[in-house]
Swiss-Prot record:
PROSITE patterns: RIBOSOMAL_L33 (PS00582). Belongs to the bacterial ribosomal protein bL33 family. Pfam families: Ribosomal_L33. InterPro entries: Ribosomal_bL33, Ribosomal_bL33_CS, Ribosomal_bL33_sf, Ribosomal_zn-bd. GO terms for biological process: translation. SUPFAM superfamilies: Zn-binding ribosomal proteins (SSF57829). This is Large ribosomal subunit protein bL33. Keywords: Ribonucleoprotein, Ribosomal protein. NCBIfam families: PRK00504.1, PRK00595.1, rpmG_bact.
């Protein structure tokens, strides 16, 4: 009998200010990978994390 897939999925968090801000320390967009439980957190995830391109803590949103 086949085992069911788990509820945990791998997601990517992308800096929201790197996409819009031109005045930053270095070019590029910062991305983090993490996991989330699909059953408990159905909405898109938003976390404040450090962005080395902006050189400060910014909001990182979940992307597809």
């Amino acid at each position: 009998m086949a085992k069911a897939k788990g509820a945990r999925i791998i997601i990517t968090l992308e800096c929201t200010e790197c996409r819009t801000n031109v005045n930053k320390r270095s070019p590029g967009v910062n991305r983090y990978t993490t996991t989330k439980n699909r059953r408990n957190t159905t909405a898109r995830l938003e976390l404040k994390k450090f962005c080395p391109h902006c050189n400060r803590h910014t909001v990182h949103k979940e992307i597809k």
